[in-house]
């Protein structure tokens, strides 16, 4: 998962025609650390998509502009548009994340 560190880089990444999955997180967030322990097999399973991470504290404007109110949150972008948003309340388990991705990508 590539870390995005600037607004410019974020804006460039989301313009792709291929869907990109962006995880918003923060270093102090216990749920984000928990997700880090189980997300790798899911990233591997959905490896035909590019995965990115954004520290919401470092890119607050990007998080705010994309209505990221809680973390961790997964957002899917394609052609510069947000296609789907898994809010933090529903991103607590591998099953919730898998269900979101299956529904979004019809896999």
Residue positions per predicted region:
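Local sequence-structure signature of Cys/Sec-based thiol-disulfide redox active-site neighborhoods
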Residues: 11-41
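Chalcogenol-based redox active-site neighborhoods
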Residues: 11, 33-34, 65-66, 83, ...
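N-terminal leader/targeting and pre-domain segments
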Residues: 1-20, 96-107
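Thiol-based oxidoreductase modules, predominantly thioredoxin-like and allied folds used
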Residues: 4-5, 24, 40-43, 47-61
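Non-catalytic, surface beta->alpha helical segment in thiol-disulfide oxidoreductase systems
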Residues: 78-107
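Structural micro-motif
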Residues: 66-75
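Short alpha-helical
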Residues: 30, 58, 92
């Amino acid at each position: 998962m590539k870390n995005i560190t600037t607004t410019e880089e974020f804006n460039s990444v989301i313009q792709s025609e291929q869907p990109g999955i962006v995880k918003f997180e923060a270093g102090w967030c216990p749920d984000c650390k928990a997700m880090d322990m189980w997300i790798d097999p899911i990233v591997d399973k959905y490896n035909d998509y590019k995965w990115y991470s954004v520290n919401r504290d470092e890119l607050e404007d990007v998080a705010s502009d994309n209505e990221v109110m809680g973390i961790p949150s997964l957002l899917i972008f394609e052609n510069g548009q947000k296609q789907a948003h898994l809010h933090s309340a529903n991103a607590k388990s591998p099953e919730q994340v898998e269900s979101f991705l299956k529904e979004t990508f019809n896999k």
